[in-house]
Design a protein with these regions (language model features):
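A binding-site-centric feature that preferentially detects glycan-recognition modules on secreted/surface proteins
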Residues: 1-105, 109-175
């Protein structure tokens, strides 16, 4: 996995900001379980890559950079609460549970918008993002996509799922 990440890092220098590859290697060596998360991201079609550094915490950010929402992470409702409430035709799982199992988080709206400054993602798909508690408490959830050169944020019932909607993950590595 380290070789794949190194190659992707070298091929997409516009994504990394001020993060040097040596910093990524040191951070991964100090947190070896992160390689398991990166492997899961890669195996489900995420194509993880370094997208910079958190300006507050200094953490190195590694995010799914596949052009479309990862194929093996689609047709999922938002969370397990929505999954339990869906009686007819339930999906095979939920985005939040899958992310937790992989050791990553869904992107926030701000993180998703930042990702879109690094390239054009989700031109034919959409991705669940973290829903604020005030929306989730009413049964809703949020997803994003890029169309017409713009990033859009939409709402839907948390129990909804579509073959074109998945989720993107982000992994934070202490620097």
């Amino acid at each position: 996995m380290l070789d794949i990440l190194r190659e992707r890092f070298a091929s997409n220098s516009n994504r990394h900001g001020d993060v040097a590859w040596e910093e990524v290697e040191v951070a991964l060596a100090q947190q070896p379980v992160a390689l398991d998360s990166l492997t899961a991201m890669e195996e489900t079609g995420g194509e993880p890559d370094v997208i910079g550094r958190d300006q507050i915490t200094g953490e190195i950010l590694i995010c799914d950079c596949a052009r479309e929402s990862p194929a093996k992470r689609r047709s999922l409702c938002y969370d397990d609460e929505a999954l339990r409430k869906r009686k007819r035709n339930p999906p095979r799982g939920s985005a939040l549970a899958q992310a937790e199992q992989m050791g990553v988080s869904l992107l926030s709206e701000d993180e998703y918008r930042y990702l879109q400054t690094l390239g054009e993602f989700d031109l034919k798909s959409s991705s669940w993002i973290i829903a604020p508690s005030e929306i989730r408490s009413l049964g809703g959830a949020l997803f994003c996509e890029r169309r017409y050169g713009r990033t859009f944020v939409f709402h839907n019932g948390a129990d909804s799922y579509y073959s074109t909607r998945g989720w993107r993950g982000i992994l934070r590595l202490p620097a």
